[in-house]
């Protein structure tokens, strides 16, 4: 009976450690995913002003050439 209790206690202890390691890994994966999302937003913030400035410079010239009213 004593060895059975020891074995069960050992299994419980190892299972608890394994479960806590899985939780830590899952938390790290979720944090990684959030970082990717934040990086996408950051790239988007840098990309939109660039496109807007290029359009602001290019569209008047294009309009002038099409209508020939410069």
From Swiss-Prot:
Keywords: Amphibian defense peptide, Antibiotic, Antimicrobial, Cleavage on pair of basic residues, Cytolysis, Disulfide bond, Fungicide, Hemolysis, Immunity, Innate immunity, Secreted, Signal. One of its GO terms (cellular component) is extracellular region. The keyword Disulfide bond applies. Its main location: secreted. Residues 1-22 form the signal peptide. Residues 23-44 form a propeptide. The keyword Cell inner membrane does not apply. InterPro entries: Antimicrobial_frog_1, Frog_antimicrobial_propeptide. It is found in: Secreted. Disulfide bonds join 64-70. GO terms for biological process: defense response to bacterium; defense response to fungus; innate immune response; killing of cells of another organism. Expressed by the skin glands. Antimicrobial peptide with activity against a variety of Gram-negative and Gram-positive bacteria and against fungi. Shows strong hemolytic activity against human erythrocytes. Belongs to the frog skin active peptide (FSAP) family. Brevinin subfamily. This is Brevinin-1MT1. It comes from Amolops mantzorum.
């Amino acid at each position: 009976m004593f060895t059975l209790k020891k074995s069960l206690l050992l299994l419980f202890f190892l299972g608890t450690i394994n479960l806590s390691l899985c939780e830590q890994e899952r938390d790290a994966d979720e944090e990684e995913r959030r970082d990717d999302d934040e990086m996408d937003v950051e790239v988007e913030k840098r990309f939109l002003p660039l496109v807007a400035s290029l359009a602001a410079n290019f569209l008047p010239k294009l309009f002038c050439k099409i209508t020939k009213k410069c």
